[in-house]
Amino acid sequence: PSNVVELFKQFNCKILLSSDPNISGKFITSLIFGTCKGSGTANAGMYMGYAKELLEFLEAEAKTKCKDDQLNFNTLCRSRDDIKVDENHVIFENFKPTQVNNESNAPFVSYPGSPGLSRYSRAVTEYAQFVYIYILCLLIVSMVFLPQHKNLLVTTTVAATAFYALFADKSCTV
């Protein structure tokens, strides 16, 4: 559309990031990726801005130790005042895989592919680093309040710890 530049200028920023559709729910999405300045969570799939600032932003993202670009985008977004998230879908809209109504007035729209077993298994190894401590705490508290299930809970705790130690990506937490 011919008015994209004018729409972008109305945001009064140097970089505009698309808003995450919170596929896992707002709490889990915020827990894993954080937010951009306390507002919505930025999605790394669609963005626009001025060339100089975009180059600086993308170079900074490439230098981070964390392998997750979306977490990096949100972390960098919090450290810069010239970045905003298109929370009202004026320019960008990301749809959830489960959304039935896929109509949008946004000039740029993203429709996710069909999530399969490989995507879900990859998500478990990638995102375990963000939720492992909560799962571990829940299992320990469960042992205290459910002593009759102690054997199962201890086994689950050992298995979860072994999985985390052997397979989970820890690039964002170490």
Residue positions per predicted region:
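Catalytic core and acceptor-binding pocket of nucleotide-sugar-dependent glycosyltransferases
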Residues: 39-140
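Short, flexible coil/linker elements and helix-boundary hinge sites characteristic
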Residues: 12, 33, 81, 146-149, ...
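Transmembrane alpha-helices
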Residues: 125-171
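Generic cytosolic/nucleocytoplasmic N-terminal low-complexity/intrinsically disordered segments
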Residues: 11-13, 104, 118, 149
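Conserved donor-nucleotide/metal-binding helix-loop-beta segment in metal-dependent transferases, i.e.
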Residues: 1-36
